[in-house]
Structure formats: C-alpha cells, structure tokens
Amino acid sequence: MATTLPVQRHPRSLFPEFSELFAAFPSFAGLRPTFDTRLMRLEDEMKEGRYEVRAELPGVDPDKDVDIMVRDGQLTIKAERTEQKDFDGRSEFAYGSFVRTVSLPVGADEDDIKATYDKGILTVSVAVSEGKPTEKHIQIRSTN
C-alpha cells in the first residue's frame, strides 16, 4: 500500500526515556522535580480522506487550556494543565505546558480543519485532497 504522507512528519525526542528517569527515584517529602519533561503524546493517521492527529490531554479544559493553530503547513497544539490532588491529608499541584507541532501532508486544506475533545483525547482532523502530486522538470542551461 502506497502512502502520500511525508516520511518524517514531526521531530522525535532525543531522550524519550528522560521522564522515566525521574520516576525511578523516590520522591522526597512527596515532591517531584519542578520541571516537567513529559511530552504531549500523539497518534496520527489518514482516515477517509482526512489526516487525523489525536493528542492525549487528560485533565485540561479544551475551551480555556488548549490552543490549536495552523501556519505554512504546520499544525501546532498548545495546552496547559493545572490541577490539584488531595490525598492522605496533603495536596499536590500538577501543572505544565505542552506544545507539539506536526507537518501537514501534501494536499492538506488549511481551511477545512475540525477539532473535538472527548474523555481526555483531542482529535484534530484536516481534509486532504486526493490529487496526485505534480512534477516539474527544470531545464538546465549550459554556461560554456
């Protein structure tokens, strides 16, 4: 089966295990490192003529905490999470900002983008035209 998607759509983390490194160490007084190394987890696929990106964003309010933008063939999802957990007579805040950018496939229609949020999963759907990519041959001039 042939695909029209670019080979590499978005950069991968150089150190995907970095966040697991901190999880391996016990927390002192219930504290974790003050910086968040987690990435926004994404899945993408072509589905019925549309490019779909699904982002795992539990615990956010999509109306207030999520911003989706498109520019020059790049789709960017920004989210911010702030939550407070109470347990064993203590409370702990969990917060962080997340940003991911993916390149849209050839033929993506930046004017036909839809987004939904359900049970912690943000789905962004972009229409993609079925047209075949065109080739252009370049004439070479001799300078001799």
UniProtKB/Swiss-Prot annotation:
Induction: Induced by several reactive nitrogen intermediates including S-nitroso glutathione (at protein level). Induced in stationary phase (at protein level). A member of the dormancy regulon. Induced in response to reduced oxygen tension (hypoxia) (at protein level), low levels of nitric oxide (NO) and carbon monoxide (CO). It is hoped that this regulon will give insight into the latent, or dormant phase of infection. Induced in mouse lungs at the same time that adaptive host immunity induces bacterial growth arrest; induction is dependent on interferon gamma. Residues 33-143 form the sHSP domain. Disruption phenotype: Strains deleted for this gene show hypervirulence upon intravenous inoculation in BALB/c mice. One of its GO terms (biological process) is cellular response to hypoxia. Transmembrane segments: none annotated. InterPro entries: A-crystallin/Hsp20_dom, HSP20-like_chaperone, Small_HSP. Keywords: Cell wall, Chaperone, Cytoplasm, Isopeptide bond, Secreted, Ubl conjugation. It comes from the Bacteria. GO terms for molecular function: protein folding chaperone; unfolded protein binding. PANTHER family: HEAT-SHOCK PROTEIN 20 FAMILY MEMBER. This is Alpha-crystallin. It comes from Mycobacterium tuberculosis (strain ATCC 25618 / H37Rv).
